[in-house]
Amino acid sequence: MGPGSPTYAVRQLRGSLAWELLRARHRLGAALVFASAAVIAIGAYSLPVYEIYKVGEDVSLVPGLDLFSDLNLPLSVIPHWNNTDGGDEIDTSRCFIGIERFIQWCNLLPTGYTTVGLDEHTGLIIDFDTGKCTVSGVSSVTLLRACNPEIFPFGSEFPISKLGSFIYPEKPDVGISVEAWDMAKSAAEIDNLGAVPAEMVRLAKERQQARLRQDWVTADSLRQKITSLGWLVQDTPEGQKIIRQP
């Protein structure tokens, strides 16, 4: 999900089946990618960019979709952190509203909330399995607590604890309707149909080891066994490739 109006995204997605399905798929292991307006919308509090920058409304907090509350992380995200579209005349950093108005917005946040500032052409990969965050792209990510910045350049890593007290839900389906959960599980099962079973991976590794020993009889026998189980092993310049038989 990407560009548009953050507040429009919040209004359209809040309480919808689509949003529940996204949350459910994430709980089941899917990777979610958000950018621009969408990444603002998923925070605990959203920045009403168009209302401030285009319409001229006063700075205010707008409750967001709060995706990270599922994981006990009170986060808001601001992209276009280092934007310079306004040149020397207008400060368009901090997602076009400028530093002065951003400070006003930041000071409205409740105590204990963290804001993630994303420079342009830069992303933050949050890996909940490893407990690490990695800065990708060309610039940096800024973390703000009580509006005090900590900057992480591209290529750097930091623990997810920097974002808050990360906790998995006690039950994966907590807070999600039965309908959405069942639909998400069905979709995940379909996705997994193409996954290579662990047994095939093990046999392919044994075959590769046999080839390295130049034990061609064993290697051919393992290939035949893999084929008999409905899979094919192909030797490519990048290594072995296991594919399901058509």
Which stretches of residues belong to each language-model region?
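Residue-level detector of anion-binding/catalytic polar loops
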Residues: 31, 114, 232
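Short His-Asn-centered micro-motif
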Residues: 2-3, 35, 79, 118
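Short, active-site-adjacent cap segments at secondary-structure transitions
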Residues: 6-7, 39-42, 123-125
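Structural preference for alpha-helix termini/caps and helix-kink/transition segments
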Residues: 181-246
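Catalytic nucleophile loop
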Residues: 22-46
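Amphipathic coiled-coil/heptad-repeat helices and related helical stalk/stem segments
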Residues: 18, 98-101, 203
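Flexible gly/pro-rich beta->alpha loop and the following alpha-helix that scaffold active-site loops
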Residues: 1-31
